[in-house]
Curated annotation (Swiss-Prot):
Taxonomic lineage of the native organism: Eukaryota, Metazoa, Chordata, Craniata, Vertebrata
Class of enzymatic activity (EC top level): translocase
A single GO BP: mitochondrial electron transport, cytochrome c to oxygen
Assembly and binders: Component of the cytochrome c oxidase (complex IV, CIV), a multisubunit enzyme composed of 14 subunits. The complex is composed of a catalytic core of 3 subunits MT-CO1, MT-CO2 and MT-CO3, encoded in the mitochondrial DNA, and 11 supernumerary subunits COX4I, COX5A, COX5B, COX6A, COX6B, COX6C, COX7A, COX7B, COX7C, COX8 and NDUFA4, which are encoded in the nuclear genome.
Side of membrane Mitochondrial matrix, spans: 1-15, 67-72, 153-155, 224-232
Catalytic activity: 4 Fe(II)-[cytochrome c] + O2 + 8 H(+)(in) = 4 Fe(III)-[cytochrome c] + 2 H2O + 4 H(+)(out)
Name the record gives this protein: Cytochrome c oxidase subunit 3
Name of one Pfam family that matches: COX3
E.C. number(s) listed in UniProt: 7.1.1.9
Family, per entry: Belongs to the cytochrome c oxidase subunit 3 family.
InterPro entries listed in its UniProt record: Cyt_c/ubiquinol_Oxase_su3, Cyt_c_oxase_su3_dom, Cyt_c_oxidase-like_su3, Cyt_c_oxidase_su3-like_sf, Cyt_c_oxidase_su3_a-hlx
Transmembrane segments: 16-34, 41-66, 73-105, 129-152, 156-183, 191-223, 233-256
Highest taxon, organism lineage: Eukaryota
UniProt entry keywords in alphabetical sequence: Membrane, Mitochondrion, Mitochondrion inner membrane, Translocase, Transmembrane, Transmembrane helix
Length: 261
């Protein structure tokens, strides 16, 4: 590393991709065990190992970028391309759920009663909690933009305030979504409506939790003066991800809650 004559970051061997993959295997297996046998041990183990992996991997990246200076402009450019490609892959991930929803709802089969929502399903009122959730996420999009502008201007106090507001709104959205799930009259096993509704909104909720975690890490890093006005790609990536989550929710709201009801 000391004799390299290029600007690229040659990453040292790391165990975290392997432990991350194993924790993902434990989590998916644990989810199946929870659904079928009501056992949460494997899921808890998977989530614990995943959190430990995330913490240690983030710690290594922060050390390499902030303290060792490995994230040169050319490395940051590569990270930007990587984040853009990741978000594009997420777009296609959600496109699958929208495809399933529209495939089922635009031409409902006789088994569904020939109508949408299917016979016996009482959909949620789109003008109640879903509309509140929409306003919460739109407000969080405004506050994350405020945080970004404050960081670019070197206004640390406003950046921390805006980031804290965004995280609070993200947590509030998650709590509202959980309360909505608790109150629904249908479940994930109630035919194609239940499965498409809970898969699409559930995976979006998971992305909100991931995005909130991402922002919490950025908040802690900002407290420790890790970001400057010209070196803050960690925060920028979190902001891009949060805007993506916002846009997906708008499509979910219009498609599943409003049109689909």
């Amino acid at each position: 590393m000391t004799h390299q004559t290029h600007a690229y970051h040659m990453v040292n061997p790391s165990p975290w991709p392997l432990t991350g993959a194993l924790s993902a295997l434990l989590m998916t297996s644990g989810l199946a065990m929870w659904f079928h046998y009501n056992l949460t041990l494997l899921l808890t183990l998977g989530m614990t190992t995943n959190l430990l992996t995330m913490y240690q991997w983030w710690r290594d990246i922060i050390r390499e970028s902030t303290f060792q200076g490995h994230h040169t402009p050319i490395v940051q450019k590569g990270l930007r391309y990587g984040m853009i490609l990741f978000i594009i892959s997420e777009v296609f991930f959600f496109a699958g759920f929208f495809w399933a929803f529209y495939h089922s709802s635009l031409a409902p089969t006789p088994e569904l009663g020939g109508c949408w929502p299917p016979t016996g399903i009482i959909p949620l009122n789109p003008l109640e909690v879903p509309l509140l959730n929409t306003s919460v996420l739109l407000a969080s999009g405004v506050s994350i933009t405020w945080a970004h502008h404050s960081l670019m201007e070197g206004n640390r106090k406003h950046m921390l305030q805006a980031l804290f507001i965004t995280i609070s709104l993200g947590v509030y959205f998650t709590l509202l979504q959980a309360s909505e799930y608790y109150e629904t009259s249908f479940t994930i096993s109630d035919g194609v409506y239940g499965s498409t509704f809970f898969m699409a909104t559930g995976f979006h909720g998971l992305h909100v939790i991931i995005g909130s975690t991402f922002l919490i890490v950025c908040f802690l890093r900002q407290l420790k003066y890790h970001f400057t006005s010209n070196h803050h790609f960690g925060f920028e990536a979190a902001a891009w991800y949060w805007h993506f989550v916002d846009v997906v929710w708008l499509f979910l709201y219009v498609s599943i809650y409003w049109w689909g009801s």
